[in-house]
Structures are given as structure tokens and as C-alpha cells.
Swiss-Prot record:
Parts of the chain that traverse the membrane: 10-28
GO cellular component labels: plasma membrane
Source organism of the structure: Escherichia coli (strain K12)
Miscellaneous: Encoded in the Qin prophage.
Protein name in the entry: Protein YnfS
Keywords: Cell inner membrane, Cell membrane, Membrane, Transmembrane, Transmembrane helix
Coiled-coil annotated residue ranges, if any: none
Main location: membrane
Induction: Expressed in both exponential and stationary phase; expression is considerably higher during stationary phase (at protein level).
Compartments reported by the entry: Cell inner membrane
One Pfam family in the UniProt entry: YnfS
Topological type in the membrane: Single-pass membrane protein
Length: 29
């Protein structure tokens, strides 16, 4: 049994990480 809340938190964290990396990449460029 998977916990939907934990899954949602993981997805939100993953998206936040991707957004952060994208911003850093734009700043470097």
C-alpha cells in the first residue's frame, strides 16, 4: 500500500528540485 501523501510530497519535492536546477542553469548561461 502506497501513501498518497508521501507520493505527492515526493513529486512536489522533485518538481521543486527541477525548477531550482533550471533557474541555476539560466543564471549560469
Amino acid at each position: 500500500m502506497n501513501n498518497p501523501v508521501c507520493l505527492d510530497d515526493w513529486l512536489i519535492g522533485f518538481k521543486s528540485l527541477c525548477c531550482t536546477l533550471a533557474v541555476i542553469a539560466l543564471l549560469i548561461i
